[in-house]
Amino acid sequence: MPEFEEWHNSLTNDEQDALDVRLELVSLRGPVLGRPYVDRVHQSRHHNMKEIRLPNGIRVLFAFDFRRSAVLLIGGNKSERDGSSPNWNRWYERVIPIADQILDRHITQLRNEEK
């Protein structure tokens, strides 16, 4: 997804390496991978949306599509400051609707390709 790629390119080499390790775990374990590496995103309208959890508040929202492929939707840092302290809930409130739209678009595209 272009939204994810743009964000991924902004990461430091160390952050990209840490993410690559988590992505390898997702690839090996699939949907059963859980905490501390992955957790479910309950606020999404997609029951299968999850987040890859990296140190320092870095998160990647993703989902497995109906082909069982992991779709990386959007990433960011939930610890970014909003005033004097991090506001984790605000980050989720902002990015989950975007991730929902990206996943909707992806699913629609896959269904159109099947026709």
Tell me what each language-model feature is.
Residues 3, 18, 29-31, 39, ...:
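Residue-level signal for well-ordered alpha-helical segments
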Residues 57-59, 64-115:
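Enriched for short, Lys/Arg-rich terminal
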Residues 1-22, 87, 103-104, 108-115:
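Arg/Lys-rich, positively charged N-terminal/basic patches that mediate binding to nucleic acids
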Residues 1-2, 36, 65, 77:
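Alpha-helix initiation/capping motif
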Residues 25-54, 113-115:
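A short, surface-exposed loop/turn module that caps and links secondary-structure elements
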Residues 15, 19-22, 37, 48, ...:
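Amphipathic alpha-helical interface surfaces
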Residues 3-7, 22, 26, 30-33, ...:
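Generic alpha-helix detector with strongest preference for long hydrophobic helices that associate
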Residues 16-19, 27, 34, 46-49, ...:
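Residues in flexible loops and secondary-structure boundaries
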